[in-house]
Amino acid sequence: SDIQPGMLKKLGMYVLRSKVKLSDANSDIVLLGVAGTGAAAALKALGTGIPSSQYDVLRFEEGTAIRLDEHRIQLAVHANAAVPVWNKLASLASPVGTPAWRWLEIAAGVPHITLATQEEFVPQMANLELIGGVSFTKGCYPGQEIVARTKYLGKVKRRTYRAHLEGDCPPAGTDLFSPDLP
C-alpha cells in the first residue's frame, strides 16, 4: 500500500488509450483470500465457480476470483457485496485473518515489495521467475534487456530467501548473512 501512489503514476505513463483510466480502487474493492484443501468446496458453495488453473481469472456477480495456486484463491469483491460474501465464506471455512494469508504468501515464495525495497531487485532476485511472475517470451517492458541478460547469463547477484528469525524483524531491505553460507 505504501508503493501504490508511485505505482499508479508509473503505470499511467504506459496508458496509450483514452478509454483506460487508472485509479485507487481501495474504497470500491475488498480483497478476500480463500485457502486450504477446502477452498474449492467453499467457493462452489458460494456459487462463484473456481478458476481452473494457476493465474486463471473467473468473474462472478460479486467480483472476480483469481487462482493463485492449487489451494489459494484471491477474491476481489465489490465493496457493497463484501460483507455478505465474507459471512457466507465464514460459515463454510475458518476465518484466520491477514497474518495467516501473509504466511501463505511467504510459503508460496511471493515477495512483499515495500517502499524501502521498491526498484532494488530485478525479478530474478525476488524469485519471480520461479513462481510464474515474469515471462521471458511475452511482451515488452522497461528493463526487459537486463532481465533477459540476467536469465541467459545465469548470474544473479543476490536472491530472496525465506527465513525464520527469532526476535524482532530487521527493517525491510536489510541484507542478511549466514556464517555457514558465504
Across the structure, where does each feature detected by a protein language model lie?
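Basic, glycine/lysine-rich polyanion-binding surfaces/domains
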Residues: 1-182
